[in-house]
Amino acid sequence: MAPYHIRQYQDSDHKSVVDVFTKGMEEHIPSTFRHMLMLPRTLLLLLGVPLALVLVSGSWLLAVVCIFFLLLLLRFLAGQPWKEYVATCLRTDMADITKSYLNAHGSFWVAESGNQVVGIVAALPVKDPPSGRKQLQLFRLSVSSQHRGQGIAKALVRTVLQFARDQGYTDVVLETSTLQQGAMTLYLGMGFQKTGQRFLTMFWRLVGIRTIQLKYPFPSA
């Protein structure tokens, strides 16, 4: 297990940070595809359309080709939301991390191992928190696949929690999805509590993938 340390982001980290973030998000595409394949409506589509073609044309070859193209379409649909999300982030906050986080009363940290960035996490103040609360939102948690299982993600979350304590925040909040079971297990194991859920878009509603809202409340002084 290679040693690692956590430090604040520097502009020279940008390319490596974008790489960790992009690969981390794109890893969700296969699991989204598998989730979609298991939906009853998807199974009905994959069986019903080819069977209808066989009944109409009498061609099993046409049915096989149809299944192949339906699978390609589903794979495209599974990947498109994640790719659009990455593209949006790279155009907005991830385009200038120093401006978006370090100069906006938040922070951005990297986990470094062997002179390589292997993990990232960010935090920003919540603009309109509930009355009487001062909340910090955790963003962009990701660890490269080769360095998982070493406690890096937990250490990055702890870094955000300590930053929030030091700055006098009452809560740390975040959002994740039902698809990201590893992240959900991590957060709940560290004391985060579920506070709500929603569908971000109509697509996510159709495929039954919810966004889960979580909160880590600090004890009152």
Curated annotation (Swiss-Prot):
PROSITE patterns: GNAT
Known EC number: 2.3.1.-
Its membrane topology: Single-pass membrane protein
Keyword list, A-Z: Acyltransferase, Developmental protein, Gastrulation, Membrane, Transferase, Transmembrane, Transmembrane helix
Database matches in Pfam families: Acetyltransf_1
Location of the protein in the cell: Membrane
Domain of life: Eukaryota
CDD domains cross-referenced by the UniProt entry: NAT_SF
One Gene Ontology biological process: gastrulation with mouth forming second
Record keyword Transferase present: yes
Keyword Acyltransferase: yes
Record-annotated N-acetyltransferase domain positions: 69-219
One GO cellular component, as annotated: membrane
Stretches assigned to coiled coil: none
Transmembrane segments: 53-73
MF terms in GO: N-acetyltransferase activity
UniProt cross-references to PANTHER family, sorted A to Z: GNAT FAMILY N-ACETYLTRANSFERASE (PTHR13947), N-ACETYLTRANSFERASE 8B-RELATED (PTHR13947:SF53)
Role of this protein: May play a role in regulation of gastrulation.
Family: Belongs to the camello family.
Protein name: N-acetyltransferase 8F1
Organism: Rattus norvegicus
